[in-house]
From Swiss-Prot:
It comes from Schizosaccharomyces pombe (strain 972 / ATCC 24843) (Fission yeast). It is found in: Nucleus; Prospore membrane. Residues 1-24 are annotated as: Disordered. This is Sec14 cytosolic factor. InterPro entries: CRAL-TRIO_dom, CRAL-TRIO_dom_sf, CRAL/TRIO_N_dom, CRAL/TRIO_N_dom_sf, PI/PC_transfer. Residues 94-267 form the CRAL-TRIO domain. Pfam families: CRAL_TRIO (PF00650), CRAL_TRIO_N (PF03765).
Length: 286
């Protein structure tokens, strides 16, 4: 069995839009009930809660058949990847060393209570990274962190916010990224993005791209026509004058100083993992 959450936390959010737990019309409720019933008939017993099934349904615009196919594909991948074993046994001992060449970390929350995730692509040096770790372990760590997001971070954030939190606020820093470095990490980024999109759908709350190089906004304008309107509204492409935009969404005390905030965690924000998930009154007790 995989790790489970034994401590209660809010299962709905009064401010959530239609299609989220506690905010369904009659058609959506019927589709949710049908999806759960079909999966139970197929022998599935885990991850059949409303919040999980609704994420798959929203990702497929409440098309029952497509949502079922997506869920079943995800369950097959979880078994093949060994996700349940990963949750119990994975240890990323090289994390601090990896962080020097590829900083990626969760750090406190935004004004809506979402965990903030920071990724700094400009620091990536795959040659040095692969002297410390392997592509396989990097992917395992990615999946492990997604699981901890669901098992520990979201429940703690939900308790503190007083309502269900099921998305994160991402800051992707492109400072120092050039054409050469983008090409070298494209394979990893593509694989990581595929895992996120296919197996952890509807986890994006806000997405800020900062220090975007010249031409990035134009390139994004070309592809945003293929994205649904709700997704486009979540994405903000910013240049080097990003500080005010970030501070509108993230309290200064929660934003690392190197990104324009006031926070200077001892030992560095990128290794602190500071947030409600480590605060006694909000974290899982078991």
């Amino acid at each position: 069995m995989s790790e489970t959450i034994s401590d209660p936390y809010p299962l709905t959010n009064p401010n959530a839009p239609l299609g989220h737990p506690g905010h369904l019309n009659s058609t959506q409720q019927a589709t949710l009930d049908s999806m759960r019933l079909e999966l139970q008939k197929l022998g599935y017993t885990e991850r059949l809660d409303d919040a999980t099934l609704l994420r798959f349904l929203r990702a497929r615009k409440f098309n029952l058949q497509q949502s079922l196919e997506m869920f079943i594909k995800c369950e097959k991948w979880r078994k093949e990847f060994g996700v349940d074993d990963l949750i119990k046994n994975f240890h990323y001992d090289e994390k601090e060393a990896v962080s020097k060449y590829y900083p990626q970390f969760y750090h406190k929350t935004d004004i809506d209570g979402r965990p903030v995730y920071v990724e700094q692509l400009g620091n990536i040096d795959l040659k040095k990274l692969y002297q410390i770790t392997t592509p396989e372990r990097m992917m395992q760590n990615l999946v492990y962190e997604y699981e901890m997001l669901a098992l520990k971070r979201f429940p703690a954030c939900s308790r503190k916010a007083g309502g269900l939190i099921e998305t994160s606020c991402t800051i992707m820093d492109l400072k120092g990224v050039g054409i050469t470095s983008i090409h070298s990490v494209y394979s990893y980024i593509r694989q990581a993005s595929s895992i996120s999109q296919d197996y952890y759908p509807e986890r994006m709350g806000k997405f800020y791209v900062i220090n975007a190089p010249w031409g990035f906004s134009s390139a994004f304008n070309l592809i945003k026509g293929f994205l649904d309107e709700a997704t486009v509204k979540k994405i903000h492409i910013l240049g080097s004058n990003y500080k005010s935009a970030l501070l509108e969404q993230i309290p200064a005390d929660n934003l690392p100083a190197k990104l324009g905030g006031n926070c200077q965690c001892p030992g560095g924000c990128e290794l602190s993992d500071a947030g409600p998930w480590h605060e006694e009154q909000w974290m899982n007790k078991n």
